[in-house]
């Protein structure tokens, strides 16, 4: 199985995240599948623990690849809040973060929760970079 020895990228504000992603895109180009995404939904209520992240509620940032894979996808929720391109209506912040983080519990931060603070950078804020091959 997949055993990454790294942690998710964290401590980035929205503008720093976008600058990094633009640099990566200019270095590697884009693919024909650039618009694809994982649309699998899941909840944190599975009593077997199969859909719970190891990091959620652990109070520490956990290395990637240590969760139980669901649909062969690792670390799709929890650990760090992830920046999205979704707008957060009724606020001054143009972008939303979602997914919960390591400092909260399952009941506090389910996968669908969104919040905002696009000018902030905390160790619990991060992003996911996907490379299509």
Write out the residue ranges for each language-model feature.
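Short aromatic-cysteine micro-motif
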Residues: 1-75, 133
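Disulfide-stabilized, aromatic/cysteine-rich ligand-recognition loop
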Residues: 4, 9, 67-68, 90-133
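Short, well-ordered loop/turn and helix-capping segments at boundaries between secondary-structure elements
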Residues: 23, 86-89
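Extended alpha-helical regions
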Residues: 54-61, 81, 105, 125
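Residue-level recognition of short, solvent-exposed, well-ordered loop/turn junctions
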Residues: 75-76, 124
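Active-site-proximal beta-strands of protease catalytic cores
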Residues: 77-86
């Amino acid at each position: 199985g997949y055993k990454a020895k790294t942690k998710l990228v964290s401590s980035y504000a929205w503008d720093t995240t976008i600058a990094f992603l633009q640099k990566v895109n200019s270095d590697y180009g884009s693919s024909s599948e650039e618009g694809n995404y994982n649309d699998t939904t899941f909840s944190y209520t599975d009593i077997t623990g199969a859909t719970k992240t190891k990091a959620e509620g652990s109070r520490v940032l956990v290395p990637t690849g240590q969760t139980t894979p669901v649909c062969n996808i690792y670390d799709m929720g929890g650990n760090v809040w992830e920046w999205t391109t979704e707008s957060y209506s009724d606020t001054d912040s143009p972008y939303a973060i979602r997914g919960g983080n390591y400092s909260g519990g399952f009941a506090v931060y389910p996968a669908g929760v969104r919040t905002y603070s696009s000018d902030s950078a905390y160790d619990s804020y991060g992003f996911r970079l996907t490379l299509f091959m």
